[in-house]
Amino acid sequence: MAEARRIRESHWGDVVTYSRKVFVPLTNMCRDTCGYCTFVKHPTSPEANIQTPEQVLATAKRGEAKGCKELLFSLGEKPEERYDAAKAALARLGYSRMTDYLADMCALVLRETTLLPHVNAGTLAEDEIERLRPVAASMGMMLETISRRLNKRGQAHFACPDKTPIQRLRTLERTGQRQVPFTTGLLIGIGETWEERVDALVAINEVHLRHGHIQEVIIQNFQTKPGIAMENHPEPSLEDMLRTIAAARIILSPEISLQAPPNLSERHIDYLQAGINDWGGISPVTIDFINPQHEWPEIRQLAASSEEAGFRLQERLTIYPRFLRHRDTFLDAGLHASLANMARQDGLARSQCLETSPCNSELPTSTAAEL
């Protein structure tokens, strides 16, 4: 792990970041049936829904009032292509394709709030990326694994058309060709081998070397949940997670941010020592809808853990500073003004919400590393 720490510190210095976000689950219907998922609801469930524009905007306004800068749209993949009920629900909103509705909700958020949309819509075709790029500051999709074995019967991704590795890799390539700032990552402990983890990290890095668009990689640990198909599947150990984080830091280009969810483990200092430099999105308003049994940590708690490990917590935007410096390449021109107003000189958030000072206080740029 010493080499992972050296790489992290040489490129990211003593700063560890987080993004203050609000989470909007635009729809919890999905055509995939992953064995570890508790987010997705069948259209016959009374809990199945597509959020209305009014609901989206109400959540966005609550987040804006709490100092959030990012709005994360997360949604199931293409439910309208599998379920008539999902197709009908979308039609009642005036749409035939979920991606088009998502794009209009991003535009609504940009028009009515100061929040920047980050879109996590799964696999995307070329025209879907083109539709979303002008209204999404960044996009994301977990690669999760490169293992085709896990698509077989009895495995985590059986009967999941969007979870075949080739489809995930094609989305990474397509977003790279269109210069979209992109988040991806691995889900650890769903049946993959160590070699398959390494292969997945290498595949992510290769597409980044071609296009330079991967802004962060998440190393996320599988968590069992009541009622899922993998309820009795073992969770990865702390040692397994730390080895994977360190391997990721060594394999990936140093400029790629490395993140691990802070609400899925309390061993924050261990994660920092293994090589991460970012805590991801944390919401003061909404729960983690993907892992609802795990509460977000308090920002002051993360700040204290970071300080104990020798780091200074800073708030970032959904776009990392490197992409802001090359905004003409990576960002639609319509987003430039909003980002300029929200970012300070070093590219981090102008208004720092660290729970130790008012959210509207701007810290001097000299207190943050040039990332």
Residue ranges and their predicted role:
Residues 5-6, 24, 107, 130, ...:
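Active-site phosphate/pyrophosphate- and oxyanion-stabilizing loops and adjacent acidic/basic residues
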Residues 13, 112-114, 134, 253, ...:
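Short, well-ordered coil/turn elements that cap or connect secondary structure elements
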Residues 41-209, 371:
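Conserved Radical SAM active-site core
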